[in-house]
């Protein structure tokens, strides 16, 4: 599960951001526009719209076309503490003139795409949030070609919930599809090896939409971090879209001795280690009957002595046969993860021009700030990947990987080197000096510095680099657009007998602690901030970049977001993702200053911005109804990022 820790960012948002109002390339033909039928625009998650009504020349004229309010501000959760965890990360999908999306409480809403008027609403009745922020990124659509257009549940909306259910709803009415699972509700809690046996499954839920391919609805999961080595299993499962019966399941950690990967694990670890789940959105290549899985870190996150080896297939990009669940190929992006460097983004399935030939590819953006690119049929890297030596000073009992994979191209989009005293930054000489003193005190050997008993600077931090917003890809100009963060974390391992004392000590106020049961060490971490709540390293702390994927070169990179009374374009922490359009624009919100922006895709110049009524920690989408192009964003804030909360879905369009 991704984590933007609330420890420190509340101070950061209150001090750092006080928001005011605010050619000559080989071309690949773009697919015909079908609106926005998938979370990522299409099954491959390219976040590209072929619509071009809105252009760099007229984008400044965009106005609010309609606003819808969900009414969900955590009222379904008991107590104000739970409400503060609400996020609104949804991206609507379009089908038959209707937008479908989930709220932060995983209620499902359908609105008229032209007017924003409510068509129907289904209340999921989630009564409790058990860990992390309440996040729900959206829904999936399936149209049953064996039924007529007017039949009940001819088109189905699949919506995951925060209490591990999968709902199948009639797209026309919002009623449960009675022939799916248990009268329209599928219980996802089976065969997961829950670590808590008290009757409530507190650390397993689904935050991203499933993907539907070949009549199967494929579902990942989100699992709580830093708790216990014997955590819930990260099994990916496919269910029949019509009746909800299990078709196949695939566990990224090999449990069966006959699995070729089993020999890379000890018997004890293969039996007990959990996680390596797929909490980001999944992607599909229906023509090749493939589903692409981004797997995350195994348990426990910051100590791996109980799981020696590379730990495949954790921290990997995986291609499975969509009909059988059999592994087609996999590539591990982090060996023996000790940094919570989940494979965090939806794999983007694109067609690249490489050495003059069109190649079916998959691009994976990572928390490390690197883009990995593979032939999606074979798994072979399109740009070479080399294994480089990494620091080897682990704690007693740890078994480190001697090397880690680095793509030759594109170059990293974020800082990866050691944090040095000269990197200290502050808004005053006083806090800059405090940061410089901390840097001298802490360990920092660059990316993949192993966690230790002495406080260590993790750069990039566990929030990225890139995050779940993934990339947006312009197929005509071969440009991948991605937002990133330069936001180091600091952390340390804690001997078990000292954990409680540190948790209770005022010296560590503001730190996040994890027990990491079943290992010799607990952990603590937080964002590396000055006493004033400002990042201790030089800006930009948030950036937007375009990468030419034909050459692997960075075309442009600009700060993303304003800070300190909106006078400094420093680039700020951000959660969300971009989209690109055939009109030559990039749209993105995501930032802590609550603005949505449009950029020229060729230059990175900002052309338009609008101050949202709440944080826009979501990914926009675009579609057309009645010859009018709309851009839609959810604005509801993010609990961990500390942005303003709300319940808005806002559509922008040019004046009629």
Functional labels for PLM-detected ranges:
Residues 17-20:
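C-terminal motif of bacterial Sec signal peptides marking the signal peptidase cleavage site
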Residues 346-395, 651-654:
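Phosphate/diphosphate-binding loops
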Residues 68-91, 121-149, 182-209, 251-281, ...:
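Extracytoplasmic beta-rich repeat domains
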Residues 295, 351, 532-553, 557-563, ...:
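Loop/turn-rich, solvent-exposed surfaces of beta-rich toroidal or solenoidal domains
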Residues 22-24:
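Bacterial signal peptide processing site
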Residues 36-40, 84-107, 132-165, 202-228, ...:
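Repeat-blade elements of multi-bladed beta-propeller folds
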Residues 28-75, 94, 545-547:
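Mature N-terminal segment immediately following signal peptide/propeptide cleavage
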Residues 169, 174, 232-246, 310-325, ...:
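Beta-propeller blade signature
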